[in-house]
Amino acid sequence: MRITFTSHGWEDYVHWAESDRKVTKRINRLIADIARDPFKGVGKPEPLKGDLSGYWSRRIDDTHRLVYKPTDDQLVIVQARYHY
């Protein structure tokens, strides 16, 4: 599965890489788990509704969520900070 980031998703990832290595490790673990199975695993995966239908989220911590969109051959990371 190919992993790509939106510009906003990459900006969030870089923010964590520069400010908090622990959160960056958690995000990397979530991404690896999503690549194995986008719909089950760590971080309480849940499908989003409404305008974000087709997207999924997983918990990075109590405040922040990793929002992503899985397709057949690609995983798009949309957001890695804040709550959707």
Swiss-Prot record:
One of its GO terms (biological process) is RNA catabolic process. Its EC number is 3.1.-.-. GO terms for molecular function: endonuclease activity; RNA binding. Coiled coil: none annotated. The active site is at E46 (proton acceptor), H83 (proton donor). Belongs to the YoeB family. This is Toxin YoeB. It comes from Streptomyces coelicolor (strain ATCC BAA-471 / A3(2) / M145).
